[in-house]
Amino acid sequence: TEAYRTMNAELEILGVKLKHYRVDAAMEIAEEYLSNDKLNTIGIVTMQMLMQASKEPTWKQYIEDLDLTVIGETEVLEAAGIDPETPSYEEVETNEFIARFFWGLIQTKSRIFVLGDTEEELQTLQKYLTETYPGIEIGGGAVVETLEESAFDSLVNEINSQTTDVIVSGLAGTRQDRFVLENSSKISAKIWLSLGEHSTLQNEAG
């Protein structure tokens, strides 16, 4: 389709390969993910994450394996040498993908499940979502305190029992890559959205 041709480029930043799509194309892809029958991963990528990935091979692998990468800061575009006059800069500055994605979830009546590293983070993220996107349906949430397999299993069961469509993860770094890499085949949700180290959202939420 025409939208797919608007992909800006395959980028390489600090040795990490990323595909960069304009928001219209990224939204088309996300809508497709909601209708297929497997768990697809979408990640918001920041400079901090890329710097971490340049030092940690598993984290680099996680970012490169994401089904859809969404650039979360204009600094990433700058590092990739993308012209500041391109529309991508405004899309990134205004977090346009995030906004359109969540409004889309309200329209499709999709259920989300929120993950956080601490109870405070979890509540902050849930509060941010309900206040920013009135009508969004949060089926549940959980704090991921441990990487033990038994804890993962009970969490996967909880996510699946809520008939979750989208998992919104505020988890830091290696916690979430381990969780997704090891459990994706067991999770019945459609999309894993990793907010990562997305400072703008965290600041707005805080």
Model-identified regions with their sequence ranges:
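N-terminal nucleotide/polyanion-binding subdomain common to many enzyme families
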Residues: 4-90
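Short glycine-rich anion-binding loops that position phosphate/pyrophosphate groups of nucleotides
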Residues: 47-50, 171-176, 198
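Structural motif
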Residues: 68, 111, 165-166, 191
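Conserved beta-alpha
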Residues: 76-158, 162
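Short gly/pro/ser/thr-enriched loop/turn and capping motifs at secondary-structure boundaries
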Residues: 76-78, 175, 198-203
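Short Gly/Thr/Asp-enriched flexible loops that form oxyanion-binding sites at enzyme active sites
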Residues: 126, 177-186
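Short, flexible loop segments at boundaries between secondary-structure elements
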Residues: 143-147, 188-206
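Proline-aspartate-enriched helix->loop->beta-strand connector
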Residues: 163-173, 189
